[in-house]
Curated annotation (Swiss-Prot):
Assembly information from the UniProt record: Associates with the 50S ribosomal subunit.
Domain KH-like as annotated: residue spans: 388-472
GO terms of molecular function: GTP binding
Protein name per UniProt: GTPase Der
Protein's UniProt keywords contain Nucleotide-binding: yes
Binding of GTP 2, residues: 218-225, 265-269, 330-333
Pfam families, alphabetized: KH_dom-like, MMR_HSR1
Family listed: Belongs to the TRAFAC class TrmE-Era-EngA-EngB-Septin-like GTPase superfamily. EngA (Der) GTPase family.
Annotated function: GTPase that plays an essential role in the late steps of ribosome biogenesis.
Organism superkingdom: Bacteria
Transmembrane residue ranges: none
Biological classification of the source: Bacteria, Pseudomonadati, Pseudomonadota, Alphaproteobacteria, Hyphomicrobiales
Native organism: Brucella melitensis biotype 2 (strain ATCC 23457)
Keywords: GTP-binding, Nucleotide-binding, Repeat, Ribosome biogenesis
Biological process, per Gene Ontology: ribosome biogenesis
Length: 483
């Protein structure tokens, strides 16, 4: 990606709607309440023939230095300093407010090139707001409707004019574009399109050099953002005593011992009964999307109050989604009798989460940076197991021995016949067993096979899928017709 744009402006002018439009997916929370976005997030974006990175930010707000709003503003100021140019968004329908004027001055002081974006220009009465926008001193406003996708060709042209063609087009694009003429009508579908979807890929064999996607989840205030900030070595995510500070799922790039990592911090996931606000419901849905984007999910538990009902519900959700879980017992620096507490936590992990027997769990202190290398070693090992593939020959040699030792029980006086097994997928490992009467197979025997697979082929701590089907015998039943 050749350049970076920061989308900034006062709260509730449509910054996240524009962000979603450019990246092609609903990655940022959008609601009518001001201050929905609290952290800055970076993602690949596309606007016709322009490919770049875009930063969505918290609304610029005046606030006391020690308040949550002040920390949000600091995040936005950091985004401006990181970007090559700024898309300063105003609400053309509402017109220019004192907050717009104040923070337009802050953007001017940064010295960064600016495109003044007049959003909601499709609304009745927006013309007056458009004219008022000239008083901000940021140049001619570019009218758009981020919600409806109107004005995107004009925005594209404004960005190119601002930064220049040499800056906005990467070298490979310059070679490709030598014989091309840009026409928005011809490529009108290319706003936010063709951004690589992390989950829309063929499942490959395990590759230790491939970037690893990790989501970090847990109850509110378990220390998720503190852990990521420690990993990154910067205050990238908001932290503080207020529960539920993180509302969006925020991604950040990291490298651990040469391995490229994409981290997803998520909103704290509360019990449904406590999710009162519409906004918080949106946040939980956003966290679910982050889990689906991830490969390994680190479940952050507060070691001082672990394994509450909500912790187990989160773990169960991750397992049902087929992701590879790893537990981080955070705030370990607050534990006194560590050896006894750790033994108790391991026992509870095995007892409360038997569906992923052997689940890896590591004590850490996100605030002090203790145990992070050990945690990551377990994350990488779990990811490797999650990608494991076993040959059909090995599976069936094992299955033959299992049946000889413990055959399936007889049902209604008829013994069930198990014929063969094959692995049909990885991520998580999935197997199919061919047998005579799948509907009659007791679930206890299915669990017996899964536990045997886990132990024999060394697959602790990951979900294992096993399904049953009848043998594909085209001549089945013909013998009865013979006379």
């Amino acid at each position: 990606m050749g350049f970076t744009l920061a989308i900034v402006g006062r709260p509730n002018v449509g910054k996240s709607t524009l962000f979603n439009r450019l990246v092609g997916r609903k990655l940022a929370l959008v609601d009518d309440l001001p201050g929905v976005t609290r952290d800055r997030r970076i993602h690949d974006a596309k606007l016709y023939d322009l490919k770049f990175q875009v930063i969505d930010t918290a609304g610029l707000e005046e606030a006391a230095n020690d308040s949550l709003e002040a920390r949000m503003r600091a995040q936005t100021e950091a985004a401006i300093s990181e970007a090559d140019a700024v898309l300063f968004v105003i609400d053309a329908k509402a017109g220019i407010t004192p907050a717009d004027s104040t923070f337009a001055e802050a953007v001017r002081r940064s010295g960064k090139p600016v495109v003044l974006v007049a959003n909601k220009a499709e609304a009745r009465g927006s013309e007056a707001g458009m004219y008022d926008a000239f008083q901000l001193g940021l140049g001619e406003p570019c009218p758009i409707s981020a919600e409806h996708g109107q004005g995107m060709p004009d925005l594209r042209d404004a960005i190119v004019e601002l930064l220049g063609e040499e800056r906005v087009f990467a070298e490979e694009r310059q070679e490709e574009a030598a014989d091309e003429v840009f026409t928005p009508a011809a490529v009108g579908a290319l706003v936010g399109d063709d951004i690589e979807d992390p989950d829309a890929e063929e499942i490959p064999a395990y590759d230790a050099t491939k970037p690893l996607r990790i989501a970090i989840v847990g109850r509110p205030n378990a220390g998720k953002s503190t852990l990521i900030n420690t990993m990154l070595g910067e205050d990238r995510l908001l932290t503080g005593p207020e529960a539920g500070i993180t509302r969006d799922s925020i991604s950040a790039d990291w490298e651990w011992h040469g391995r490229k990592i994409k981290l997803f911090d998520t909103a704290g996931m509360r019990r449904k009964a406590r999710v009162q606000e519409k906004l918080e419901k949106l946040s939980v849905a956003d966290s679910l999307r982050a889990i689906r984007f991830a490969e390994v999910v680190i479940i952050v538990l507060d070691a001082t109050i672990p394994f509450e009902k909500q912790d187990l519900q989160i773990a169960d959700l991750i397992i049902r989604e087929g992701r590879a879980p790893v537990i981080a017992f955070n705030k370990w620096d607050l534990i006194e009798d560590r050896q006894m507490v750790l033994a108790d936590l391991y026992e509870k992990t095995a007892r409360l989460l038997p569906q992923v027997r052997g689940l890896r769990a590591v004590p850490i202190s996100g605030e002090r940076g203790q145990g992070i290398d050990k945690l990551m070693e377990n994350v990488v090992k779990t990811h490797e197991i999650w990608n494991r593939r076993i040959s059909t020959g090995r599976l069936n040699r094992w299955l033959e021995g299992v049946i000889a030792h413990q055959p399936p029980p007889a049902v209604s006086g008829r013994r069930l016949k198990v014929k063969y097994m094959t692995q049909v997928k990885t991520r998580p490992p999935g197997f199919v067993v061919s047998c005579s009467r799948p509907d009659a197979m007791p679930q206890s025997y299915v669990r017996y096979l899964i536990n045997g697979l886990r132990e024999t082929f060394d697959m602790p701590g990951v979900p294992i899928r096993l399904s049953l089907r009848t043998s594909d015998n085209p001549f089945a039943g013909r013998a009865k017709k013979k006379k």
